[in-house]
Amino acid sequence: MHRPPYDARMRVLMPVPDRDFDVTEVAVPWRLLTDAGHDVIFATERAGTRPACDPRLLTGVLFGRLGAAEEPRRFYEELNRSEEFASTVGWADLAPEAFDGLILPGGHAPGMRQFLGSEVLQRQIGGFWELNRPVGAICHGVVVLARARTVAGGRSVLFHRRTTCLPKYLERSAYLATAWRLGRYYRTYPAYVEDEVRAALAAPDTQFARGPRVLSARGTAADDTHAFVVQDGNYLSARWPGDAYLFGRRFCEMLEAADGA
């Protein structure tokens, strides 16, 4: 049954670490969801923490390059001034049933480990997954789902799902191009993201989709030519910041479909 118009505003949960998340992967979905009339509720490990992005992505990772594009940076500035960004909910205090959708953004700098490795957050996400509501993950955010377990059976929630994530070749290329100056900045963990995600799948050769090869070309607000996402039922995944606009638009469509179910 279609929900009445007064209930069309959906509540989307977006957990983030205290620092080092990706500018584009947070700010673009936030902007698109907000423009569509939805509420985005941010969650940090401790309630009331004002989170901060990876600062290198605002100025350029190396020689002013490899950072976020101008529009996502502007979106982030708007987000950083918003009330919801300072009024975060604590991970342990989350009630999964209170949200209509869940987005897990990525990032690769060291501060992301707080988010990627939290067993508390993984349990909460496992609980939300059981509700069969829209879930989206982009880049390293897919790792959280790979580590989250179903309530029954103890397998990853992704075990039977099709998915993408940050491709191994892209993570490796970024590391090799910058290691001389930034060390392991692009290597969040010794294992590559793709390797960990594939290991969580029942049949990785058929369930995992790497997508077209990219190195620098990105999707934009007006052009999805270089963007790629994978949708499997209520689950949506994307590879990197270059997919963020398509990812955000598709997630809005998933919310609308869920609202009309």
Show where each model-derived region lies.
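Extended, subdomain-level signal for the structured scaffold at the beginning of enzyme domains
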Residues: M1-L131, V144-A261
